[in-house]
């Protein structure tokens, strides 16, 4: 069944995010400290939405769009209008296609909502502060360094924060690595099959669709959110969307992507562990994962 509540969160988050990015990058970029504090506040607010539950998609969409757009808009060669229009266009198309497919291929039986996790105030504060702080550090690193070709590394660091606690981040990072490796191996196979005919869309689309279909099925069967299938979907999308051009060497891109994602995950997990230990020193932000 098509969920209007989810669809509204999806589109509203994209629209609000575009306005925020214009204000942050357009007006606050000349004051880096103030800009960083505003970004931190937005991250904490969005991870708090995710931790509380009902507005999870609003928060998660905001985190992903904020991280991606802040990275691209920091480069002078980026066209803001194209970036924001593409963001809104993609969100509207995703909702419209989802509604269409729900109508054409309805569920056989009603879906049961996942059980809601009861969280105390200390756990919510722990999760929002931990994830918000680490996401802000990632933002600062990508603002200082020239990492415009490391979108997968950026997304890997952000997406493993979605469990919002240390143990969940460790498990998520393992799934992420496996998904990235599987997708990169598939892309290498496509490179061998297509060779230098990648500019022929009629040859590429069936292979891209096959890879996405397999990854989507794996994602649905896992039932764990951002697992192996989800990591594979995002990797295929990024690789084919950004790097598949005529005579582009996807072998180097594959190896670079695996290396950059691994480094990003190790650094992010280290930061998550340190923040987890620090926040657990205070009763107001203490969270101990129970077995």
Protein language model regions, located:
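Alpha-helical transmembrane segments and their membrane-interface boundaries
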Residues: 1-57, 71-208, 215-291
């Amino acid at each position: 069944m098509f969920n209007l509540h989810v669809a509204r969160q999806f589109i509203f988050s994209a629209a609000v995010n575009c306005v925020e990015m214009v204000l942050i990058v357009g007006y606050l970029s000349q004051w880096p400290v103030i800009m960083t504090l505003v970004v931190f506040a937005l991250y904490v607010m969005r991870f708090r939405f995710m931790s509380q539950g009902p507005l999870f998609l609003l928060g998660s969409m905001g985190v992903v769009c904020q991280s991606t757009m802040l990275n691209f808009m920091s480069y002078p060669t980026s066209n803001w209008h194209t970036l924001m229009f593409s963001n809104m266009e993609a969100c509207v198309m995703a909702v419209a296609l989802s509604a269409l497919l729900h109508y054409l291929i309805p569920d056989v039986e009603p879906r049961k909502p996942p059980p809601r996790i009861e969280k105390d105030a200390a756990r919510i504060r722990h999760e929002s502060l931990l994830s918000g702080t680490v996401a802000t550090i990632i933002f600062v690193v990508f603002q200082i360094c020239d990492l415009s070709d490391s979108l997968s590394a950026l997304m890997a660091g952000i997406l493993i924060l979605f469990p919002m606690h240390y143990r969940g981040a460790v498990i998520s990072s393992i799934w992420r690595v496996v998904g990235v490796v599987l997708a990169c191996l598939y892309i290498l196979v496509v490179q061998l099959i297509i060779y230098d005919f990648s500019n022929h869309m009629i040859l590429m689309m069936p292979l891209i669709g096959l890879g996405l279909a397999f990854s989507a099925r794996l994602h649905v069967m896992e039932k764990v959110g951002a697992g192996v299938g989800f990591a594979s979907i995002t990797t295929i999308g990024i690789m084919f969307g950004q790097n598949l051009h005529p005579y582009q060497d996807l072998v180097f891109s594959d190896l670079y992507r695996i290396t950059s994602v691994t480094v990003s995950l190790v650094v992010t997990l280290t930061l998550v562990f340190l923040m987890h230990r620090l926040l657990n020193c205070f009763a107001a932000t203490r969270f101990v994962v129970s077995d």
